[in-house]
């Protein structure tokens, strides 16, 4: 930003970073008030597209579920441990709690390290999830390039 960039998108790919990114953007805004500072998880930007491609009854890319397992099977298949002894883990929140942040460590949420449906993950789906995500991120970047930069308000002097 000190080199003159006027627009910034921090693209998050790990849910645990979300709050830190928001705080960082707020702090940067104080130092660079005339810069368009943005951040998002790829899964938020491509939520509709990912949901349309999912076969599992989840409503989002849960930790190591169908979406994440598929993406890793595409990008780094050597990191996916194929096993049949794990059962899918469906723990959706009741509708009344949707949108509520619940503070939990992953170890408190699951014993096996995943939520959702890793059994539904395939490399073929991973390619589709990746393409949909990249397409949406590019669309967002193109739109950000058309947006006006923030105006810095100067205090009135009387």
Kindly give the residue locations of the regions a language model identified.
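Extended, histidine- and acidic-residue-enriched regions that form the cofactor-binding/catalytic faces
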Residues: 1-9, 15-158
């Amino acid at each position: 930003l000190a080199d003159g960039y006027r627009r910034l998108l921090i693209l998050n790919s790990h849910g645990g970073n979300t709050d830190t990114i928001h705080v960082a953007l707020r702090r940067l805004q104080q130092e660079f008030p005339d810069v368009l500072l943005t951040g998002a998880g790829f899964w938020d930007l491509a939520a509709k597209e990912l949901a349309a491609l999912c076969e599992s009854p989840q409503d989002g890319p849960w930790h190591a579920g169908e979406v994440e397992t598929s993406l890793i099977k595409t990008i780094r298949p050597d990191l996916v441990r194929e096993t049949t002894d794990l059962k899918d883990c469906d723990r959706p929140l009741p509708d009344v709690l949707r949108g509520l942040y619940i503070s939990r460590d992953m170890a408190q949420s699951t014993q096996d390290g995943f939520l959702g449906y890793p059994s539904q993950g395939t490399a073929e789906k991973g390619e589709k999830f990746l393409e949909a995500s990249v397409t949406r991120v590019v669309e967002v970047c193109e739109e950000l390039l058309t947006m006006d930069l923030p105006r810095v308000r100067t205090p009135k002097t009387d």
